[in-house]
Swiss-Prot record:
Its EC number is 3.2.1.4. Residues 45-298 form the GH26 domain. One of its GO terms (cellular component) is extracellular region. GO terms for molecular function: beta-glucosidase activity; cellulase activity. GO terms for biological process: cellulose catabolic process. This enzyme catalyzes the endohydrolysis of 1,4-beta-glucosidic linkages in cellulose, lichenin and cereal beta-D-glucans. PANTHER family: ENDOGLUCANASE, GLUCAN ENDO-1,6-BETA-GLUCOSIDASE B. It catalyses: Endohydrolysis of (1->4)-beta-D-glucosidic linkages in cellulose, lichenin and cereal beta-D-glucans. This is Endoglucanase H. The gene is celH. Residues 1-44 form the signal peptide.
């Protein structure tokens, strides 16, 4: 409850309250009536208040502090629910500020309450940290300690909710609250809003103090008290509760105030779903029966004597007039078949700036061509507010819906997404709330469309966004979509421009209506740089390996695949271009992928011509269209026999010590490569010990560079780590990558690439990298990769220092070596001592005979391995009659010792 109101706000309150405003939505057709009944809500207290007001309470309000356990609350909760009402608890942490809470000082208490409320099971509306836009509570932003900020409040509120969710207390609904006025430095209505994922309801507290207070309070109408806060909260797509309100008797007509208050709520505050009176004689007499006139007005306003059934606890939106039906994702993918992208249109900065604007006749032409799906990329950034509440421009949302309706009306499976909204990756944690609000509005606008409309969360995330953040984003947005679109199919993908390499690494949410997506533009030099030709056996083998890789992921995870983009620039070799479209589309459709070819409507551009459909002449490139729809038209392909799997080698005993690969004391044996304007050079300079290799590199936006050392012996299976000394020599502290390349499966170029990122600084550092710390390279894999997903240490081709970004710099490296165990990891075994009694005699000979004759039982596999090591006397990795002969000769003293 608000304790005081500054006089400086009073004049502003009166003036602003006189202004009209337009409310949003219409949620209060069944306004819920609630109250703090003036004391803790026992059965008798609830009954007495209901008799007084002449109506059952829908909501019963309770105040507790953070020294109160749920065991104390439970009898009151039982009384509330036995009455058929909802319990709303205002939870006041008098002992803590928001910094304490976010830092975990109250975690034990919060956890205990979460567990107890979960066990209770009934729905509870919980209102923690209320009226924080004031200056009278220890958790408030304006409090005199100045320790609370918007940021610490948000973190504290979210921390509380996260603990409840972690303990499974999903029966608790979260109520965010503001005071009717902002009081104190740094306060605002929405600056401390925790975000839609953490709030189920918003609420406002406000009082008409009349002329009762010494600080100069004056009589205010309901609108003068509540209009400003309501306008702020109405911008959030959450139902609103008037959680505390009341009027004084002194200074005006309380009965009239009550009547006008409820009239205002029902006519102008359409997002308000509940009004909860504060019934107590406290700072002044707030009770509904402070006078007979007030009580009569209150009973009339709430409809005393009317029948009001038990309220539905959780607000739900108006059900759609024609809800989309649930469709199995595999069935949807089969329905989608071959489709197209409406590229460079709604995902341009502004429609028409990259290509011809969308026209309805396009969809007639797509239909005639045979397409079954249309992907409509959409960029929302330039049409969305950059500050809270991040509202999408209505005209643009209407335009997107118009284009979607054109597509759906022709029977197309239609996909809309977030496309080129690259701002999310620049500061994921700072921008995710805006992205969530965008998707909340998309989901709300399109919730009534047919099941043939699919949502794709994000097109081609890349750059600074991590795989973990992409997983988090997919999870967050999916939860938002599911609130209004419970069965709509949603498409998810991985990073690095929706690469197949990252698709197989994404964390798949537990949801039955998902499709995975990937894009394919390989080889990039051909598809985007129009260099060389395409169509060799090896070219096609590479596609088959990649698509089989994706299909295997699909089968393992029982999730269908949408091949969302593929294309070649028009300036590429024409015959090769047609072959590429033909083979790629065949390979995808044969594996059950749905497809959408990339078509951006651009003709004649040297760096952007990927059009198949001419939007002006309404004609298609029929040769490519034929390649897309007719299998095997151009290339002749005979799949290679499946390669013989590499034999599984037995575990090896780790080497002990170190092996120098290059200390740079002789001839420099490193090569280099670069392209797209990037450059690299190497030379011998002074190193950490003796000589080292200096690498000087210049990066560019699309450039690449690297230095490479080809290995004479590529079997590292007995080694545990690789180590080198490195430092930056020009003051730069740029990230670079150290890469291990396997041997190619076809003998051409490299095999699978494995990388580890490092950031050298100006002092020498020894970097030791366990081989288990290398990760499969995501931005590129060569055609010769085996796609095993395992670093094959017995099949290493080369090592590289290479680019990680477009920066320039210089570093020196020295003493590259392999690291083994620090000591012999196997216990000492005496060869020939098969019963391990530290003697070699006839007993051991008898045991060896029995083992060879398979009549010796050794127990566990570990015991057998130990026996075999002692019995393998000629060290040929097998135990046979040759070992028996050696042992006989030793016992007969024909040889003086067993060879080791």
């Amino acid at each position: 409850m608000k304790k005081r109101l500054l006089v400086s706000f009073l004049v502003l309150s009166i003036i602003v309250g006189l202004l009209s405003f337009q409310s949003l939505g219409n949620y209060n057709s069944g306004l819920k009536i609630g109250a703090w009944v003036g004391t803790q809500p026992s059965e008798s207290a609830i009954k007495s208040f209901q008799e007084l007001q002449g109506r059952k309470l829908d909501i019963v309000h309770q105040f507790i502090n953070w020294s109160t356990d749920f065991s104390w609350v439970r009898p009151y909760a039982d009384a509330v629910y036995n009455n058929g009402s909802i319990l709303m608890i205002t939870w006041e942490p008098w002992e803590y500020n928001t910094v304490d809470i976010k830092n975990g000082k109250a975690d034990a208490y919060i956890t205990r309450m979460a567990q107890d409320m979960k066990a209770y099971g009934k729905e509870i509306w919980l209102r923690p940290l209320h009226e924080a836009n004031g200056d009278w509570y220890p958790w408030a932003i304006g409090y005199s300690s100045r320790v609370n900020t918007n940021e610490t409040y948000i973190a504290a509120f979210r921390h509380i909710v996260d603990i409840f969710r972690a303990n499974g207390a999903t029966n608790v609904k979260w109520v965010f609250n503001v005071n009717c006025d902002n009081v104190g430095n740094g306060t605002s209505y929405l600056g401390h809003y925790p975000g839609d994922n953490y709030v189920d309801y918003t609420s406002i507290d406000g009082y008409n103090w009349g002329t009762t207070q010494s600080w100069g309070s004056q009589w205010q109408s309901f609108d003068q008290v509540f209009s400003r806060a309501y306008q702020a909260l109405a911008s959030i797509n959450k139902p609103i509760i008037i959680a505390e309100f009341a009027s004084a008797e002194i200074g005006g007509n309380k009965a009239r105030w009550i009547t006008e208050a409820y009239n205002s709520i029902r006519t102008s505050y359409n997002k308000v779903i509940a009004a909860v009176w504060f019934h107590e004689n406290k700072e002044t007499d707030w009770r509904i029966n402070s006078s007979p006139e007030a009580l009569a007005a209150y009973r009339e306003a709430i409809g005393a004597g009317s029948s009001n059934p038990t309220p539905t606890p959780t607000w739900t939106s108006t059900p759609p007039s024609s809800s989309p039906k649930a469709v199995d994702p595999f069935e949807m993918v089969r329905k989608m078949g071959m489709g197209t992208n409406l590229g460079n249109t709604l995902e341009a900065p502004y429609e028409g700036s990259w290509s011809k604007s969308a026209m309805e006749y396009y969809f007639d032409d797509f239909k005639a061509a045979g397409y079954k799906n249309v992907r409509i990329p959409v960029r929302w950034d330039n049409h969305t507010m950059r500050t809270y509440p991040y509202t999408i421009d209505k005209a643009f949302l209407d335009r997107v819906e118009q284009v979607v309706d054109w597509s759906l009306s022709r029977g197309f499976v239609t996909i809309i997404n977030s496309h080129h909204d690259d701002w999310i990756k620049e500061d994921y944690n700072g921008n995710i709330e805006r992205f969530e609000k965008i998707w909340e509005q998309i989901a709300e606008r399109f919730k009534n469309k047919s099941e043939n409309l699919l949502f794709e969360i994000m097109n081609e995330p890349f750059g600074n966004i991590t795989d973990e953040q992409i997983d988090d984003m997919n999870s967050r947005i999916l939860k938002i979509i599911r609130k209004t679109n419970p069965t709509r199919i949603v498409i998810i993908g991985g990073g690095y421009w929706n690469s197949y390499n990252t698709l197989v690494n994404i964390k798949i949410p537990d949801d039955p209506y998902l499709i995975g997506t990937f894009h394919y533009y390989d080889p990039y030099e051909f598809t985007h740089k129009w260099r060389g030709t395409w169509g060799t056996q090896e070219d096609m083998d590479t596609v088959v390996r990649v698509f089989d890789f994706v299909k295997s992921w699909s089968d393992r995870n029982n999730i269908p695949v949408y091949f969302g983009e593929f294309a070649v620039m028009a300036y590429a070799d024409r015959t090769s271009r047609v072959k590429w479209y033909d083979f790629i589309s065949d390979a995808a459709l044969e594996r059950g992928f749905a497809c959408s070819v990339w078509d951006n409507g651009v003709f004649g551009s040297l760096d952007n011509d990927m059009a198949i459909y001419n939007r002006d002449t309404r004609t298609f490139d029929t040769e490519i269209l034929n390649a897309l729809f007719n299998p095997g038209t151009y290339p002749s392909y005979s799949p290679k026999p499946s390669p013989t799997p590499r034999p599984t080698k037995p575990p090896v005993t780790p080497a002990v010590g170190e092996k120098m690969l290059d200390d740079f004391e002789g001839v420099l044996n490193w090569g280099s490569y670069s392209g797209e304007g990037a450059k690299v050079s190497t030379k011998i300079v002074s190193g950490k010990t003796g000589n080292g290799m200096e690498v000087s590199y210049t990066g560019t936006t699309d450039g690449y560079w690297g230095t490479v050392y080809s290995l004479p012996d590529g079997d590292w299976s007995k080694w545990l780590k690789i180590s080198f000394d490195i430092k930056s020599v020009d003051g730069s502290a740029n990230e670079i990558r150290f890469m291990i390349a396997e041997k190619s499966i076809n003998g051409v170029g490299d095999g699978e690439h494995w990388v580890y990122s490092i950031t050298p600084d100006s002092s020498w550092k020894t970097i030791e990298i366990p081989f288990s710390s290398f990760r499969r390279r995501l931005d590129y894999q060569p055609p010769g990769q085996d796609m095993s997903g395992t670093l094959d240490l017995d099949n290493i081709d080369s090592i590289h220092f290479m680019y990680a970004n477009n920066k320039s710099g210089k570093f020196v490296v020295d003493n590259i070596k392999l690291i083994g165990a620090t000591s012999d990891p196997t216990p000492s075994i005496k060869h020939g001592d098969l019963n391990f009694d530290n003697a070699v005699n006839s007993t051991d000979l008898l045991m060896l005979k029995r083992y060879i004759l398979k009549s010796l039982e050794l127990g566990t596999s570990e015991q057998e391995e130990k026996f075999k090591k002692a019995a393998d006397l000629n060290r040929d990795n097998k135990v046979d009659s040759t070992d028996l002969t050696i042992l006989k000769r030793y016992l007969l003293k024909a040889i003086s010792e067993i060879p080791i």
